[in-house]
Amino acid sequence: VTDHDSARAIPEARREAARLGLNLVPGIEISCQYEGKNFHLLGYGIHAGDPVFAAIEKDVYGQRRSISEKILDAVEALGIVLDRPAVWKLCSGDAVASVHIARVALEDPRNADCPVLAPYRPGGARSDAPYVNFGWDICGQGGPAFVPMTFMDFAQAVAIIHDHGGVAVLAHPGANMKQNRPLTEKLIATGLDGLEAYCSYHDEGTSAFYRRIADEHGLMATLGSDYHGRAKPHIRLGTYGHPDPQALWVRLCQKIKQQHGEVYVS
C-alpha cells in the first residue's frame, strides 16, 4: 500500500491483510523534485508510524489545500465550466484532486462542446483513462492549469526512506520523463534501489528501456499497476505483468530485510 504522501492507511491495511490472509508491504509514494522536475518516489517496507511520514503528509496536503481554489480558477480560465460544490463533494478533506475536477467537468452538459475536454471523451485520444489523463495533461507540471508546489529534494526523499527501513524505487519513470537515460542515471546516483519498469503508463518499449537500465546498475525492475479505482477504469488491481513476479517478491523482501524494514506476512 503506497498512498500519495501519506502512510496513514497502513494500520487499517494491516488489519485487513491479517483478516484476509494476505501479505502486506507498508509503503508510501513521496512527491519530490530533481532539478525542478517533479517525480514520485516509492518507499517499500517503511516503518509507517514514524513521525517523518506524518510530517510529509501535513506539509504536502497543507500546500494542496492552499492552492485548491487557484487550480479551480485556472481550469475555469480554459473555458471549462465547473460546478465547484460538486467538485468539493467528491473530495476527501479540504483539498481538490484533478481527477474529481475532470469527472465533474466531463459530466456537466454545459461542457459538451468544450474543445479542451474533447480528447477525454469516448473515442478521444486520451479517453482510455480520462480523469487521470486530464490531471497529467491539464493540471500536471507543464499543463495550462498547473499551479506549482514545493516538494522535497529527490535525494532527501531517498534518504528518508532508507533511514526509516524502506527501499526506494522510482515510480512510473516513463510518465515523468519518457525514455531519458541521462536523467535516470542522475537519479540512480542518489541511491535508488529500483525502477518501476512495469506499470500502466509504459508500453513494451518503455518497460524494456527501464528494465535494461535497472539490470545494468544491479537494481530491481519492479512493477506496479498504479491502480486508482474509478479514476483508472482500464486497470485491474495487481496487473501489469512482470516476467517473474515471485522472484521480484523474494528480492524485494530480502532488500527490505537488509534495510531493517517491515513486511507483514500472513
Residues of each region from the PLM?
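A metal-dependent hydrolase metal-coordination microenvironment
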Residues: V1-H100, V104, T190, L195-A231, ...
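Active-site gating loops and adjacent loop-to-helix segments of metal-dependent hydrolytic enzymes
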Residues: Q33-R65, A102-G143, G238-Y264
